[in-house]
Amino acid sequence: MNKNTSTVVSPSLLEKDPAFQMITIAKETGLGLKVLGGINRNEGPLVYIQEIIPGGDCYKDGRLKPGDQLVSVNKESMIGVSFEEAKSIITGAKLRLESAWEIAFIRQKSDNIQPENLSCTSLIEASGEYGPQASTLSLFSSPPEILIPKTSSTPKTNNDILSSCEIKTGYNKTVQIPITSENSTVGLSNTDVASAWTENYGLQEKISLNPSVRFKAEKLEMALNYLGIQPTKEQHQALRQQVQADSKGTVSFGDFVQVARNLFCLQLDEVNVGAHEISNILDSQLLPCDSSEADEMERLKCERDDALKEVNTLKEKLLESDKQRKQLTEELQNVKQEAKAVVEETRALRSRIHLAEAAQRQAHGMEMDYEEVIRLLEAKITELKAQLADYSDQNKESVQDLKKRIMVLDCQLRKSEMARKTFEASTEKLLHFVEAIQEVFSDNSTPLSNLSERRAVLASQTSLTPLGRNGRSIPATLALESKELVKSVRALLDMDCLPYGWEEAYTADGIKYFINHVTQTTSWIHPVMSVLNLSRSEENEEDCSRELPNQKS
């Protein structure tokens, strides 16, 4: 991408200039300066004083003169700024609450030079990784004389297109300097140059090209870029189609200007560009400069290239920083959404817990004690888990102990659940048995047939054996059935009675074994049976020890 840039001079170099001055002016009404120049104007890239308005602070002070170069205003640099930025700096300094103007400027060598005589410009092309860079350096014109170009003092570029120029002096004498173009396919004769003269005194210069002169199409398109017009791909194609090129790739200058006017009329109107400006871009004007000025210009060009590289590097870093900031912002939004979802899920879980607790509170009285135990165990588990989380980094042994206790309590919780189910089953059997007894004893006047049928129904409900056929031994049968019921209930209650911390489990093959969560051990034998066997073996040993002394005696 081609950009129009300007050669700027660093403030540190300007301060070494003997013409550099720093003045302070009392702030009363306003600065009263009219400026021109800037990096986006033909008079640039530097900013000069065009006029000092009467009644302003500078007019009252009298030290500034038209034609002086402004370096800074109130410590704000005027180097490398556009015309609009320069005006904005002056306006901003006026609005600040400061008691004085601090102005740095460079007094030009000749005091009678006016800004309107700043018409000698030079086009410098710099090649590098950023493509060709165009910069315009404004110079003051010297007293009327004939400028003869010298090879040693004229800056050379890769794409210079030089033509004949006519210079009018104060003696009304026209001198034509024919210069050949390296890239032009047609030599320019004296008839190819049209001179434009003015009647004003001093040095006046104007260059015009014959419309029949032919140039490379790339050179003319590059001139459009220098004028601030960036054609699109479609406009490039349309321009190549409408302009007829010969076998050498050259086109007529007049045809190109006419097609460009029709194709880029809006852009040309905005920048106020005509054929004269395009010819000025194509023709490198000759500047009277010595070797030191050429070296200074080359050094400034290198500084400008370095500054452009640094600016592009900073832009890339800024883009990368913006990209990272956007990425972090997106990640933060995602984290916030996830946190919000977790909070909502937690609230839903809490609501479900409250509903479960309400349902448990509404259960019958037999389950109240069990629920109380469950709540206490849950609170204890929560407390132990909290303690485990708080002291996990401080004491690993305590963590292991807490884990064991949690596992034991969890085991006891599951055993309590099984006990509750066992109690419910036993209670249900007892209730059915009591209801059957009530039915039998409450209806003594019922016929034997009806009584036997009701007994059969009750027996099927309570899993009892049918009572006697004739009903004569009802009390004895009830007593017998009650004993059997007591045995079955007791068997249910004693069936899975495991000690504290013990729990039964099954292998993948379905073999039952027992886990002791307290000691972290397993056993194939029921812990109660192992204890009984151990006690019996101890008793046998004691008996044997007692029998041995008796035999000896």
Curated annotation (Swiss-Prot):
Provide any one GO MF term from the record.
syntaxin binding
Q: Which Pfam families match?
A: PDZ, WW
For this UniProt record, give its keywords in alphabetical order, as a comma-separated list: Coiled coil, Cytoplasm, Phosphoprotein, Repeat
Domain (PDZ): residue spans on this chain: 19-105
Q: How is it modified after translation?
A: Phosphorylated on Ser-99 by PKB/AKT2 after insulin treatment. Phosphorylation on Ser-99 abolishes the interaction with STX4A.
An example of a Gene Ontology cellular component annotation for this protein is: extracellular exosome
Q: Which GO terms describe its biological process?
A: cellular response to type II interferon; DNA damage response; insulin receptor signaling pathway; positive regulation of cell cycle G1/S phase transition; positive regulation of keratinocyte proliferation; protein stabilization; protein targeting; regulation of D-glucose transmembrane transport
Superkingdom per UniProt: Eukaryota
All copies of the WW domain together span: 496-529
Location comes to: Cytoplasm
Query: Where is coiled-coil annotated?
Result: 291-417
Q: Which of the residues bear the PTM Phosphoserine?
A: S10, S12, S99, S212, S463
What role does this protein play?
Plays a role in the translocation of transport vesicles from the cytoplasm to the plasma membrane. Inhibits the translocation of SLC2A4 from intracellular vesicles to the plasma membrane by STX4A binding and preventing the interaction between STX4A and VAMP2. Stimulation with insulin disrupts the interaction with STX4A, leading to increased levels of SLC2A4 at the plasma membrane. May also play a role in the regulation of insulin release by pancreatic beta cells after stimulation by glucose.
Its assembly, as annotated, is: Interacts with STX4A.
Q: What is this protein called?
A: Syntaxin-binding protein 4
The primary gene name is STXBP4
